[in-house]
């Protein structure tokens, strides 16, 4: 038993030494004259940076669609699903962090260097479980992040329309596609320090604006809260919440940007607790005020009264969507760089040029499927369910299936989980629940709703869910 413990300590020492060396290098970089302020804004590898990145990335445009989900689910189910999926998301993010540390400790033991190389989830799967798992991880992760980026573009166009309706949403998508393409200049998550901080501040403002504005507005006349009304709506709403707390597809990249990745384990959980303070009050207040009207208004901004406070919320969410686009797209940039052999290039401008082809299909898909709201649920059911719930839980069970793997695990079981049996029971529950409820029922409901949107509005819809113009005015009709 003593030799096993010594072996484990040896295994982890290499990882610790490498990480400490990286931290020293970062400190040396910051020591040069005149670079202190730049490093303060640009270089972020602390626990706090990771927390801001997780919280900022987790709740973006989906904040605006959660009241819509509540109208489909009803108040009680909406609250329960938020808490349930928030905790489940934190659990699977924890599993991903454990697998990352396991993979990295094994590779460091083999003297593998990760200088100028960002470890990604599919590489962790390949290192621990083989090439088939790499293919599965790569396919699901890239497709999810691709559509995650598409959703941010759609949200930009949907939001700006509520300030300036002189251009249709499709035209705004063209404009914001060009703006979001500038994220190619941000090298990695290590350089998102100031953006993550600002992004979370913007989301916090918008969430509390929605809450206060809905309460001040009060309930609309003859308000009706009929949810849950239809099974299709119920599972569509539940799957949008599954999508909300499935933002940990970039966990590995965020961990790799940290100076001490082992400290990540509980960060996502604490980020989720903060996110609850934004998502629950805003969704509850807006649904309380507008009720079933939300069934035809997937973007909460469309029902809130137009004033300077709302316009500020729209603008801040636009900036935050630009940041979240970068979060979703950066792992895709890394994959593309590795494919074309540019990943270890030090020049920011050369890498930016190489990354541009990634933005083109995202731009195109945002113009084809402009269905803000329904597309979230479809992506949640078909992609998020496997990418960040089923695959991590299954991978964890398979990685530690042998007694020797469990004994030599780089990370011990958490104190709240006294045995491996309980660990396996929780993981099996996650896999079964998400496969049946998230992918099965959620997939059926989301695709039914998505196809209905295509039939109603058509592909390449010029202005999805835009109210008709008043004949005598250029302003949109107030609801």
Swiss-Prot record:
Induction: Transient induction in roots by S.meliloti. It is a multi-pass membrane protein. One of its GO terms (cellular component) is plasma membrane. Residues 1-58, 100-134, 193-195, 253-265, 335-355, 399-421 are cytoplasmic. The keyword Membrane applies. Shoots and roots of nodulating plants. Higher levels in roots, flowers and stems, lower in nodules, leaves, petioles and shoot apices. GO terms for molecular function: symporter activity. Residues 77-78, 156-171, 217-231, 287-313, 377, 443-479 are extracellular. It comes from the Eukaryota. Pfam families: Aa_trans. Glycans are attached at residue 474. It is found in: Cell membrane. Its main location: membrane. The chain crosses the membrane at residues 59-76, 79-99, 135-155, 172-192, 196-216, 232-252, 266-286, 314-334, 356-376, 378-398, 422-442. Keywords: Amino-acid transport, Auxin signaling pathway, Cell membrane, Glycoprotein, Membrane, Symport, Transmembrane, Transmembrane helix, Transport. InterPro entries: AA_transpt_TM. GO terms for biological process: amino acid transport; auxin-activated signaling pathway. Belongs to the amino acid/polyamine transporter 2 family. Amino acid/auxin permease (AAAP) (TC 2.A.18.1) subfamily. Carrier protein involved in proton-driven auxin influx. Mediates the formation of auxin gradient from developing leaves (site of auxin biosynthesis) to tips by contributing to the loading of auxin in vascular tissues and facilitating acropetal (base to tip) auxin transport within inner tissues of the root apex, and basipetal (tip to base) auxin transport within outer tissues of the root apex. May be involved in lateral roots and nodules formation. PANTHER family: OS05G0424000 PROTEIN-RELATED. This is Auxin transporter-like protein 1. It comes from Medicago truncatula.
